[in-house]
Amino acid sequence: MLTRKQYLLLSFIDQRLKLSGVSPSFDEMKDALGLKSKSGIHRLIKGLEERGFLKRLPHRARALEVLRLPCNLTFDGDGEALDDGQPAPLFGGPLPETGFSPQVIRGNFTPTLPSTQVPQVLFTESISLPLLGKIAAGTPIAALIDPTSSIDVPASMVRGGEHFALRIEGDSMIEAGILSGDLAVVRRCDEAENGTVIVALVDNEEATLKRLRRKGASIALEPANRAFKTQIYGPDRVRIQGRLVGLIRSY
């Protein structure tokens, strides 16, 4: 049985590990949950360890391993989570052993998710982001345009920095859990580490969503679909516009 804060912390740690391969710092965890001190994070991690959801790796700084994620999760009136104890994934799909797995919010987002949706967590805050149009997860399409509308997303997705949203079009990233029609939440940046899923602007004309790989002086934009080929460009042909931090999926 998990408390709401334990569940949210476990979700945050799992998301960060899948995005970057590195556990968040205690300060980052404290800020993400809105706590005033790191002692509260220590207590939450201890509780997750005792319940078999989390493991601290010895002799390594900031080393946490998510052992399992709860399924069929609901909260009772006291904020306790009722879990059937099975090692199932948090967001309803298979838990990958490696590779990128973005945070996915299912359903059309509103500040409070209906109880019939998964995960059944109440998001009390939202933030409005500019929706810049469509981006290809396939063959690059037209470059990013000025915002024509906006969309509300959970505030926990956009901690720090400038963010925007794009509608995914194409299926070249499906093996990373990124589907055509998903709404991508992107943090604006012009640098990214190898393996990061980025928004890339090619030849100042076409935008695409791919995994970044640096190969010597060249830049490779790598799909997550065996039917597509990796595209390699000179460093002066590709500009990083941002990195993917989350997805919103409608059904």
Curated annotation (Swiss-Prot):
One of its GO terms (molecular function) is serine-type endopeptidase activity. It comes from the Bacteria. Its EC number is 3.4.21.88. The record marks A137, G138 as: Cleavage. The keyword Cytoplasm does not apply. Residues 26-46 bind DNA. The active site is at S172, K210. It is an enzyme of class 3 (hydrolase). It catalyses: Hydrolysis of Ala-|-Gly bond in repressor LexA. Gene3D superfamilies: Umud Fragment, subunit A, Winged helix-like DNA-binding domain superfamily/Winged helix DNA-binding domain. GO terms for biological process: DNA repair; DNA replication; negative regulation of DNA-templated transcription; proteolysis; SOS response. Keywords: Autocatalytic cleavage, DNA damage, DNA repair, DNA replication, DNA-binding, Hydrolase, Repressor, SOS response, Transcription, Transcription regulation. Belongs to the peptidase S24 family. Represses a number of genes involved in the response to DNA damage (SOS response), including recA and lexA. In the presence of single-stranded DNA, RecA interacts with LexA causing an autocatalytic cleavage which disrupts the DNA-binding part of LexA, leading to derepression of the SOS regulon and eventually DNA repair. Homodimer. This is LexA repressor. The gene is lexA.
